[in-house]
Amino acid sequence: MLDRLQAVENRYEKLNELLSDPAIISDSNKLREYSKEQSDIQETVEVYREYKDVREQLKDAKAMLEDKLDAEMREMVKEEVSELESQEKTLSERLKILLVPKDPNDDKNVIVEVRGAAGGDEAALFAGDLYRMYSRYAEVQGWKTEIIEASYTELGGYKEIIFMINGKGAFAKLKFENGAHRVQRVPETESGGRIHTSTATVAVLPEAEEVEIDIHEKDVRVDTFASSGPGGQSVNTTMSAVRLTHLPTGVVVSCQDEKSQIKNKEKAMKVLRARVYDKFRQEAQAEYDQNRKQAVGTGDRSERIRTYNFPQNRVTDHRIGLTIQKLDQILQGKLDDFINALVMEDQAQRMEAAE
């Protein structure tokens, strides 16, 4: 491990030199590439330097115990050794995690797609609950949420809602939300008080930049149509809504949230790029994972990942067996307990795979 850490520190120092080179400074692509690489390894280098400093202090403290010391001084040095050993262990564990290969998409913005699935109107209402949950979580994180496309129901739910969350680390936190979310509750329209079970699916896609996925104009068919509101009625007499079809993959995206056709096309292209990128990413990940089973699902949209039980005010994540009796707070966006546990489980899996 120490050899790998030293190599990372050497690379960090080399990047410092490169970023001071006038030739690099004048090349915006290289400057961006090297700056990102340096930023990605900065925390590892800082923790490694702290680790080396603690080890040096520990070595000196243990050497002092070899000297002739009075009882009081010896006790003080022993306490210092104990404290330094604890620090060394903590830093060593942090370094093991930092050395685990990082998902290159973790720092990206995300496009989230929530759809009502089994359960009709109740599923659509639950899709709305999930959208508000993620919006509130994003707000707490200081991220910005923007609706790209929404298909409403007459009761105020969503057949489908697609929205973007802009914020560093959004994908790292939200990628584990991929899958089928199940809700158990008594619908307001249920006079007999029977509990109904409905589901909504969530897809979390990392935003893809143009440099990462090259979509040629000739490969995209553009169709325009009049926007429609709840119930299918026309709300716009101009052809402002846009449907994009990526011919090589068959991926289709529609957007009618904006009054301007140009803005709808821009939003639709963001989603199209993300979906095509995600399709290739999923295929590559499936090939990588075929020889090992992952404990935390991040891609299978059909996987039932979580149950929200209203009568018992509890939420259970089935992947890690975690149940929390705070459903009301979770729907207000307080997702940290689940997200932190899922991140830790993923890190453990990655560490195991790297060994």
From Swiss-Prot:
Keyword match Cytoplasm: yes
Cytoplasm is among the record's keywords: yes
NCBIfam families (alphabetical): prfA, PRK00591.1
InterPro entries: PCRF, Pep_chain_release_fac_I, Pep_chain_release_fac_I_sf, Prokaryotic/Mito_RF, RF-1
Residues found modified as N5-methylglutamine: 233
Domain of life of the native organism: Bacteria
SMART domains: PCRF
Organism lineage: Bacteria, Bacillati, Bacillota, Bacilli, Bacillales
Record localization: Cytoplasm
UniProt function note: Peptide chain release factor 1 directs the termination of translation in response to the peptide chain termination codons UAG and UAA.
Gene Ontology annotations for the cellular component aspect, listed alphabetically: cytoplasm
Post-translational modification: Methylated by PrmC. Methylation increases the termination efficiency of RF1.
Major location (coarse): cytoplasm
Keyword set, alphabetical order: Cytoplasm, Methylation, Protein biosynthesis
The protein, known as: Peptide chain release factor 1
Annotated source species: Bacillus anthracis
